[in-house]
């Protein structure tokens, strides 16, 4: 059974239809990168997947837990308790870190497992220290966010998401708010998670990274999935004109910036 499945998701903001029947299934251990131009629907799809936005129509499930079913052409969401269970199954890492500025690094990582999952504090803190070491943040547990670089803050955010022991982790442009010099350290952490077969969906504009780390690449444009396949297929032999145009535009922009 898929860890995550969205079917025929539609979402409009007023007269603007942002998602036009998007379907995505992610299997355990799979790494899926979602690429595409700005305004193509990537972040909206991710927000619907993680219950930050509601779909107008379509279904959404995490394993056996159904978050939204469809009735009479509209999405009908599960009750509060069922959605709380669904939320425990995924983690989300935002562009802007969203750390609590008045909490130490350790408290940022430990707060939700202790307060939401009601887990033992000593156990959670011990696991958090291991996670911070894994993130290259050993010795930073008592620091506050303002004392860290953007790359370090993003790695704290990743550790915080992992502390909840999610079955799948979503990333929304995890390097877009970072100085280019700090991007590599965050991408290395995500790559290490992929090597450990962590199930992940990554919205990214980092094409070389998407190519290197993904099992599958999805090109989303105009609110629809235009093309998807292995990194080799999508990047080396795209079948759709819109995919070819997007990748060519990316290459030209990258060359101009080099």
Each model region followed by its residue ranges:
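Conserved ABC transporter NBD signature motif
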Residues: 58-72
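Short coil-to-helix segment of the ABC ATPase nucleotide-binding domain corresponding to the Q-loop/switch region
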Residues: 103-111
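Conserved ABC ATPase signature
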Residues: 144-148, 152
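A short, proline-enriched helix->beta-strand linker immediately N-terminal to the Walker B motif
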Residues: 163-167
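Catalytic Walker B motif of ABC-type/P-loop ATPase nucleotide-binding domains
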Residues: 169-172
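ABC ATPase "signature
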Residues: 228-229
């Amino acid at each position: 059974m898929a860890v995550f499945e969205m079917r025929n998701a539609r979402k409009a903001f007023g007269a603007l239809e942002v998602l036009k029947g998007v379907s995505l299934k992610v299997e355990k251990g799979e790494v899926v990168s979602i690429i595409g131009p700005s305004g193509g629907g990537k972040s909206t799809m991710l927000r619907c997947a993680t219950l930050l936005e509601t779909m107008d129509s379509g279904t959404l499930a995490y394993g056996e837990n159904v978050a939204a079913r469809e009735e009479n052409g509209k999405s009908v969401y599960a009750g509060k308790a069922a959605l709380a269970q669904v939320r425990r199954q995924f983690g989300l890492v935002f562009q802007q870190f969203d750390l609590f500025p008045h909490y130490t690094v350790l408290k940022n990582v430990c707060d939700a497992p202790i307060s939401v999952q009601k887990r033992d504090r000593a156990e959670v803190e011990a696991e958090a220290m291991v996670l911070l070491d894994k993130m290259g943040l050993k010795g930073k547990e008592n620091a506050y966010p303002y004392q860290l670089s953007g790359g370090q803050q993003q790695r704290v955010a990743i550790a915080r998401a992992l502390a909840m022991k999610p079955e799948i982790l979503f990333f929304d442009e995890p390097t877009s708010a970072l100085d280019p010099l700090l991007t590599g350290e965050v991408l290395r952490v995500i790559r290490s998670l992929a090597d450990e077969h962590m199930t992940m969906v990554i919205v990214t504009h980092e094409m070389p990274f998407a190519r290197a780390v993904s099992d599958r690449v999805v090109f989303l444009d105009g609110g629809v999935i235009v093309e998807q396949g292995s990194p080799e297929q999508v990047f080396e032999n795209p079948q759709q004109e819109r995919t070819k145009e997007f990748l060519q535009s990316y290459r030209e922009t990258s060359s101009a910036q080099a």
